[in-house]
Amino acid sequence: MRKGLLLASAASVFALLASLSAHAADKIKIGVTATLEGTYTVLGEDGMRGYELAVKAHDGKAGGKEIETIVASTDASPDSAVRAAKKLVEQDKVDVLISPLSGAEGIAIRDYSKTQPQITVINASSGALETTYVDPSPTFYRYNMDGAQWHAGLGDYIYNTKHYKKIATVAEDYAFTYTQVFGLALEFCQLGGQITKRLWVPLGTKDFASTIASLPDDVDAIYLGLGGADAVNFLNQYQQAGGNAKLIGGSIMVDQTVLSSKGKAKEALIGTVAASGMADADPNPKWQAFAKSYQTMPKEGYFKNAFPGPSLLAISYYNSADAVFKALDQVKGDLSDDNKKFREALKNMVLDAPNGKITLDENRQAIGSNFVTEVIKDEKGDLVSKVVKIVPNVQQRLGFSKEVFDKIGLPGRDVPECKKSYP
């Protein structure tokens, strides 16, 4: 009798384990990191909205399996990004990692990915140039352009159309905004433009008084490479100090993470020229459909405090997740042999994204279209970016040969030099 009970009990346990195993096999675990704390919280929240739109667009399935999402929070620092990635990869055992959001995080996650060759990492939205250009990881894929690519066309537009010949810059002191200023300077300076002062501020700066006092008066415009709470704090304090210079915006200075902020300080951005991988008022039907899907989501979860329209972070996370899900569909969820088929599908993908066609170069870095924009107030009274120019097929070296591009140096506080020609 006892032996029979033991056999029955063992059979029940075996059946339960088999059932759990089969249930797990019906799911694909996707790990996602986002800046859900600190200066860039609003950016991380909108990134997650973009991710959720991609899950919805694929009916919650990829490669014939149900998508299970595990989210880990970061604060935009490299250490927090690696901690989050380690949890997802080493504890939660995710199948694919979509990470991270911010520039310095990207370099750290690239390096971490080299220690975990069994996992494929798809960049969420980070935009430092070094992430994919310097010693790239063979398992790291980026479907968004970097910060320099996101400024293609801006230098030409401010010099030749707006007639700004001398500018100063204020930007956050880290890899992404180094890359943004790098892209702006290369184009603007070759045309004859001058950057008379470059000011760098730490992420999370609360008091901009000394920075504002250091701004030169004899410039045609000031470039602002700020984001999130930093952008809003600067605008408030700049207006209180009586600042009235013409402004040029970085990619996350003039998207909905700032244009939808509370208060009147954002009004100073009306007329601001900027450049980015998207534009709020892009007339492209695919973009309009994407924006509508964002706007009509139920106001719950991440969408409870959604913006009037998707930001650069939303479209970047959407595209990254969409690429993952499409590649998984293509290989029918096959992640065997160190993701070989899956990675081949990612590498060769032509992503017909809401913000234009995206392909990858030899370093698995995005090539796509860039949008030069101007901030306007629309018929609803919302601030939005309208398209004034589109630059297609923007590659990471910005038209330079590898030899010349490498001689210019990596983006930094003083790189590139502002000059009319580069070796």
Descriptions of predicted regions:
Residues 19-24:
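Sec/Tat signal peptide C-region and signal peptidase I cleavage site
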Residues 28, 347-423:
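Solvent-exposed, acidic/polar segments of extracytosolic/periplasmic ligand-binding ectodomains
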Residues 31-52, 72-79, 101-102, 170-178, ...:
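Extracytoplasmic "Venus flytrap"
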Residues 42-47, 57, 61-133, 143, ...:
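Beta-alpha junction/loop-to-helix N-cap segments that form part of ligand/metal-binding clefts
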Residues 74, 122-130, 203-204, 244-266, ...:
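Venus flytrap/periplasmic-binding-protein-like
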Residues 80-83, 129-132, 138-242, 281, ...:
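Extracellular/periplasmic Venus flytrap/periplasmic-binding protein
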Residues 88, 92-102, 120-124, 166-171, ...:
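Periplasmic-binding protein-like
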Residues 137, 238-319, 329-333, 385-386, ...:
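Extracellular/periplasmic periplasmic-binding protein-like sensory domains
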